[in-house]
Amino acid sequence: MTNLLPEMAEIWQQTLNWQPTDSQQARFQQLYELILEGNRQLNLTRITEPQEFWEKHLWDSLRGVAPQQQLISSLQLGASVIDIGTGAGFPGVPVAIIASNSTITLVDSTRKKITFIDTILSELALTNAKTLVSRAEEIGQQPQHREQYDVALIRAVGTASPCAEYTLPLLKLGGLAVIYRGTWTEEETTSVENAAQQLGGTVELIDNFTTPLTNSVRHCLYLRKVAKTPANFPRAVGVPSQKPI
Ligand SMILES: C[S@@+](CC[C@H](N)C(=O)[O-])C[C@H]1O[C@@H](n2cnc3c(N)ncnc32)[C@H](O)[C@@H]1O
């Protein structure tokens, strides 16, 4: 099995001012192997080469939580985190590996993806993560999930406005949504500012960076929950993406 680049330690250090411990590195390696194995039966990800996996899945997942010192501290101390549309477990599983004091809820609407993640969690003995088959629009209206989380992560689930509608209702006051995006435009800034404001949020930071191996453009948006989300949000299943705020 291809070794998942232990020589990346220096790049972790240079870019995130952090390095995985040996046991975290071993779990990253095991995660990579399990995903390659799972890909034989399920179409989980087209990213399978070790360098690409490292950069686009591991590094990218962790880069999203790295720039905010307050966020890192809260993950280290123990935060309640939800990852919406986690797919094969990104960014939630790498975050669960590095933030062992936090609880990570991994949500996806596709049962077969969640069944696969259940296997990953059990193989990696990741007891701080749990799974849920559901849609963001549904759990956003359920009292056991609405306004219950400190951090909501969302990567590659849609444009920023629906992502704001999926995540902000789930956050406690003061909580933070991290929306992982590729390219970004000024028009998107205007539309997400408007969406966030209607949902009780504010745009705290739009972080623009490139990935360390292929210089690919990335953006992460950080939305802070500053007021209660009005009861009519999130709207019914499908509406946030079909009729963005
Ligand atoms: C392109 S994949 C991204 C997976 C992962 N976040 C990543 O970055 O590799 C989008 C995932 O979001 C899930 N999804 C889409 N809309 C959703 C919703 N409203 N609620 C929950 N999951 C959703 C899909 O089932 C799919 O697994």
From Swiss-Prot:
Alphabetized HAMAP family for the sequence: 16SrRNA_methyltr_G
Primary location group: cytoplasm
Key word Thylakoid present: no
NCBIfam families per UniProt: rsmG_gidB
Residues the record lists as binding S-adenosyl-L-methionine: 85, 90, 108-110, 136-137, 155
Assigned protein family: Belongs to the methyltransferase superfamily. RNA methyltransferase RsmG family.
Tagged with keyword Cytoplasm: yes
Example of a GO cellular component annotation carried by this entry: cytosol
Domain of life: Bacteria
Organism: Nostoc sp. (strain PCC 7120 / SAG 25.82 / UTEX 2576)
Keyword terms, alphabetized: Cytoplasm, Methyltransferase, rRNA processing, S-adenosyl-L-methionine, Transferase
Protein name: Ribosomal RNA small subunit methyltransferase G
Coiled-coil regions, chain positions: none
Enzyme Commission numbers on file: 2.1.1.-
Entry GO MF terms: rRNA (guanine-N7-)-methyltransferase activity
Enzyme class: transferase
Subcellular location per the Swiss-Prot or TrEMBL entry: Cytoplasm
Functional summary from the UniProt entry: Specifically methylates the N7 position of a guanine in 16S rRNA.
